[in-house]
A protein has these predicted regions:
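Enzymes that bind and transform nitrogen-containing heteroaromatic metabolites
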Residues: 1-184
């Protein structure tokens, strides 16, 4: 196997490019119905999910999805102590391809955060990244990528070889949009 068929990232950000408050809480101002429908619709076709210890996608299917849980608390890889379908993975100790092979799935990998996880996959290489924007303000929060807010999330994606492939309005009343980013 070696790599997923595709690596897709999903994030909704505030005006400042934040995905959560400083204390790692995703506020209600980012939990918008239209974006949640888009997000869970995308996850429906994913073979597995990648997330950090403090984040997950929620929803009724979350517990059943195979997943890579990125952590620095182990040297390489280990079975998740509470989830037989999950693998703890330290990117500093093991290549992504080895972790993916050990997960024993094939298909799309959906990356759902948090900031360090989104940043790690910038280097591994997203095939697609769906960046939703909400008009919420979260000053001094947790950024979607390293380097935000000094740079915009869009600038970070561009610096990693991604190009905008169009923006869709998810909900005009709440001013929520999603931009699809793909390889240049």
């Amino acid at each position: 196997m070696g790599r997923p068929q595709r690596i897709e990232g999903y994030a909704i950000v505030s005006r400042e490019g934040m995905i959560a408050t400083a204390d790692r809480v995703m506020p209600a101002t980012l939990k918008l119905d239209a974006d949640q429908r888009f997000f869970h619709g995308g996850l429906a076709h994913a073979a597995a999910v990648a997330n950090g210890r403090h984040s997950n996608e929620g929803g009724p299917q979350a517990a059943a999805r195979p997943r890579l849980v990125l952590t620095r608390r182990i040297p390489t890889m280990a079975p998740h102590p509470d989830n037989p379908d999950a693998l703890l993975w330290n990117p500093a100790g093991t290549r992504f391809e080895d972790a993916w092979d050990r997960l024993k799935v094939d298909g799309v990998l959906a990356v759902v955060g948090g900031p360090d996880v989104f940043g790690e996959f910038l280097d591994i290489g997203y095939d697609l990244f769906f960046l939703s924007r909400a008009p919420a303000s979260i000053p001094n929060g947790r950024p979607v990528f390293p380097g935000v807010p000094a740079r915009t999330p869009e600038a970070v994606l561009t610096e990693h070889g991604m190009v905008s492939q169009g923006t869709e309005v998810l909900d005009a009343a709440s001013h929520v949009t999603v931009t699809r980013w793909g390889r240049g």
